[in-house]
Amino acid sequence: MLIKEYRMVLPLTVEEYQIAQLYMVAKKSKESTKGGEGIEIIKNEPFDNEKGKGQYTEKIIYLANSLPRFAAAILPSSALKIEEKAWNAYPYCKTEYSCPFFGEKLVLSIESMHLPGRGEVENALKCDAETLKQRHVDFIDIANDQPKEYIKEEDPKIFKSVKTERGPLDDPKWRDKVEPVMTCYKLVHAEFKYWGFQTKVENVIQDTGVRDVLLKAHRALFCWIDEWFGLTIEDIRKIEEETKAELAKKLEENKAANK
């Protein structure tokens, strides 16, 4: 198993990030749903149980176009989708991913904590001693780290917010100076139980499936600040319902077009 803790310093308050993250997820879901792949929202409802109290979501992520054509052609449909279950008890969140094709041989879980500060909390997720020994800490810089796919409109080094006047984040040491400031801590467990492939696949999952996705998503999150700033949680729930209906319609249209 490969365990990494990603830390992202952001020029936001913890309260602002709650709205920003939910808005970003809804918008990114719509952007990624096209041509036979995308996201289907199964559940989005409150929960109150042993995991805490918050919002529970269940999604299916379709990957057909993310794989080489030959792989998509030979793999069963169960290998082309990922199931996501998330418990958002903000500021703590937990997300679990599974793939029906691999069953228990593929494990991916993400625990998140959101706190004020510049990434200085050494055990934000309250890990035990054994986990701390295995954990690799990786700071993600949303301005200076380069994603695999560059989008000019989502570049914090050149973006300036009209509503908040935050940005551009063009100082190499912006994380030491920016106000307001918070950190998103994400503890990621990745395990692929296939002898001979384990280390390589776990590294790919962490580097491409998690780190690059987090980097791109949070670059966009900051650059979309003028879209979400001032929204309430009620506004977000309405956007989520509209997104759920829109995604369902897109997926049905895609299925019909691919028949």
Swiss-Prot record:
Pfam family, one: IP_trans
Gene Ontology molecular function, alphabetical: phosphatidylcholine binding; phosphatidylcholine transporter activity; phosphatidylinositol binding; phosphatidylinositol transfer activity
Keyword tags: Coiled coil, Cytoplasm, Golgi apparatus, Lipid-binding, Transport
An example Gene Ontology CC term for this record: cell periphery
Database matches in InterPro entries: PI_transfer, PI_transfer_N, START-like_dom_sf
Coiled coil: 231-259
PANTHER family for this protein: PHOSPHATIDYLINOSITOL TRANSFER PROTEIN (PTHR10658), PROTEIN RETINAL DEGENERATION B (PTHR10658:SF81)
Family, per entry: Belongs to the PtdIns transfer protein family. PI transfer class IIA subfamily.
Protein name: Phosphatidylinositol transfer protein 2
The species this protein was found in: Dictyostelium discoideum (Social amoeba)
